[in-house]
Regions:
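Class I SAM-dependent methyltransferase Rossmann-like catalytic core
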Residues: 1-8
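A general structural signal for stabilizing positions within well-ordered secondary structure
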Residues: 4, 47, 54, 67-68, ...
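Residue-level signal for beta-strand positions within conserved beta-sheet cores that form or flank
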Residues: 6, 29-31, 158, 177
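SAM cofactor-binding core of SAM-dependent methyltransferases
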Residues: 8-62
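Generic enzyme active-site microenvironment
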Residues: 10, 35, 78, 119-120
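Glycine-rich His-Gly loop
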Residues: 15-16, 79-83
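Short, conserved beta-strand segments within well-ordered enzyme catalytic domains
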Residues: 35, 54-56, 76-80, 87
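Class I S-adenosyl-L-methionine
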Residues: 63-76, 83-200
Length: 200
């Protein structure tokens, strides 16, 4: 995938200050091409960390993928939507349907510019994404919206797989577990990196 990404563009949605973009750069050897974030302070930090990236200080929903990419093929589209309204760390606090629904923007990209690979990272509870009862997740419909999201990607011709991974198994100094989803439409298999640290 690395060689092909020199001929395709890489897009980081919900780019924040550039953590995911830095990881992508470490993996593929170059900066991401486009970074999108609604927060001016986050985009300012991203610009400082990734000065060669094209920046959009807008809501991910306000970006037209066709215009932003300018007809260039998209090799990788990365999504790290706000996780606070899924995380168990939030406790019993109310959740916001609009924030929980941010991941749907991945379908907008899939439908308009068809990235070869889509990756999404979030808290492990993301796979329990379901409808709300008032301002709380409906305990009887855990995972229903997540399944709809996955099926929508599949209807767009994507093969989809997901896993929960621990950062410490890949050399990061934290034991937290994160959810990762990979979707690809190029007919090639989804391959997960093998752990590099810890017990075999």
């Amino acid at each position: 995938m690395e060689r092909e990404l020199w001929d395709e563009i890489v897009v980081d949605n919900f780019a924040g200050g550039g953590g995911a973009s830095t990881g992508i750069k470490m993996a593929i050897g170059r900066d991401v091409d486009i970074a999108i974030n609604h927060d001016p302070a986050a985009i300012a930090m991203h610009k400082a960390n990734h000065p060669y990236t094209e920046h959009y200080n807008e809501s991910v929903w306000d970006i037209d993928p066709v215009t932003a990419t300018g007809g260039r093929p998209v090799g990788l589209c990365w999504f790290s939507p706000d996780c606070k309204h899924f995380s168990k760390a939030k406790g019993g606090k109310p959740v916001d349907k609009n924030i929980r629904g941010l991941a749907w923007v991945a379908l907008k990209w899939a439908a308009t510019v068809r990235p070869r690979v889509i990756m999404l990272e979030n808290v492990e509870e993301f796979k329990t994404w379901g409808p709300l009862l008032g301002d709380r997740p409906d305990p009887n419909q855990k995972g229903r919206t997540f399944n709809c999201f996955v099926n929508a990607l599949r209807r767009h011709g994507y093969q989809v797989d997901w896993r929960e991974l621990r950062a410490c198994d890949y050399g990061a100094p934290t034991i937290r577990k994160r959810f990762f989803l990979i979707a690809r439409c190029d007919g090639r298999p989804i391959v997960w990196a093998k752990p590099t640290h810890g017990e075999a």
